[in-house]
Amino acid sequence: MNPFSLAKKIFDAKTGKDPIDQDVDHGLPFKAKVGSLITLNVSPFLRAEGTLVKAPDRMQTVVAISRLRMPMDGKLYRLYLTKGDDASEMESFIQVYMTAKGDIDELQYYQRMLRMYPETEVDYNLFTGRSEEGLGFKEFSLWKEQMAGIGYDEVLLDEAFGDEEQLVFERQIPGADFLRPFTATENRIDNSAGSEGLLQEVIFMPYVRELESGGQELLLLSAETVKEQNHRQKQEVHVDFMIGVPLTESDVSIQ
């Protein structure tokens, strides 16, 4: 599995509408359901020495499932281990790309480092691609001082940054200095009846950096506009900084 290939599939996708399923909880990877028990192999997290990712619990429960709808041949799902609807709550999920034939092609584990609420239109435009800088630029840096300022784990910061003041991530899609970020609609269900959930528009771009240990660390930046929660209209705009590592199909077991 090449962590670059999903981004390339999205970038190369033909324009057009993604067919809308009546139920997101259908034909899911690993036959997962809300409430399923998930077991994670710890090896990918141990191999990712120097990462900012906090090693997750080995056994967890799928608390929500979403699908991101956008022009692409396959389907992109997220199996949420924690929803993180509140900024103070951890958000984590396993992102799964399935081919048009229904085969699992790529998996990544992500957890949220930071959620910020843009206060001005200028701030917001940096994470939507409208200003043609910020999100979509070929490189994105995380600064140690900023991460320490939000109270991020000091041990992880020291291991990841070492003597450096910044970590530089490269956009997963090569090419021009700036590429317009991807846009999707995320439909999340929080229970088997579908009576609880979330609907939001997502503008995102994936980045990556090579670790000295030989692994890779993934950075997913997303500007999200919440439209509905539990079938009630809601308007909230925030930007999520998600850090992650690639997984293989054998790293995930669901019952």
Predicted regions: what they are:
Residues M1-R58, I65-Q255:
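Mixed-charge, low-complexity intrinsically disordered regions
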